[in-house]
From Swiss-Prot:
This is UPF0114 protein KPN78578_33570. Keywords: Cell membrane, Membrane, Transmembrane, Transmembrane helix. It is a multi-pass membrane protein. The chain crosses the membrane at residues 15-35, 53-73, 109-126, 136-156. The keyword Transmembrane helix applies. The lineage of its organism: Bacteria, Pseudomonadati, Pseudomonadota, Gammaproteobacteria, Enterobacterales. GO terms for cellular component: plasma membrane. It comes from Klebsiella pneumoniae subsp. pneumoniae (strain ATCC 700721 / MGH 78578). Disulfide bonds: none annotated.
Length: 164
């Protein structure tokens, strides 16, 4: 009975495979939105204001960071929790594949969230005159919470590595 339960639990990790595949569908949707934003701005490229152009570019950078985060979570999560990716060595293989454990993935996700939050906060500050002060305050508090959380996770990771 024990062996059956252990095998069933071990096999259940494959339930995560469609979840990681679903993230790739999210990446497709994000790519469509990315190019939709580009095609939206192109006809107005010569008439758009500098601040609107910067806001558009920040949106594109934001989407790019989210896309990178999705790729990182998809591949690292799949390799850490489901099965090793069977990709031939060579130019196409990402250098970090197989080298990122759950802890380093968590730290990279936290750093990515801070970067995404920073860009969002910059976009808010560029339009600060139209944003109520209390809303600005909450954006800053939420961003600082992300920064502090990422710092604490990195610090705790460093502490556990030193002790072992």
């Amino acid at each position: 009975m024990e062996r059956f339960l252990e095998n069933a639990m071990y096999a259940s990790r494959w339930l995560l495979a469609p979840v990681y595949f679903g993230l790739s569908l999210g990446l497709i949707a994000l790519t469509i939105k990315f190019f939709q934003e580009i095609f939206h701005i192109l006809p107005h490229i010569f008439s758009v204001s500098e601040s609107d152009m910067i806001l558009t570019l920040l949106s594109l950078v934001d989407m790019t960071l989210v896309g990178g985060l999705l790729v990182m979570v998809m591949f690292s999560g799949y390799e850490n929790f489901v099965s090793q990716l069977d990709i031939n060595e060579g130019k196409e293989k990402l250098s970090w594949l197989g080298k990122m454990d759950a802890t380093s993935l968590k730290n990279k996700v936290a750093a990515s969230i801070v970067a995404i939050s920073s860009i969002h906060l910059l976009r808010v500050f560029m339009d600060a005159k139209n944003v109520p002060d209390n809303k600005l305050m909450w954006y800053v508090i939420i961003h600082l919470t992300f920064v502090l959380s990422a710092f604490v996770m990195g610090y705790l990771d460093r502490l556990t590595k030193v002790k072992h």
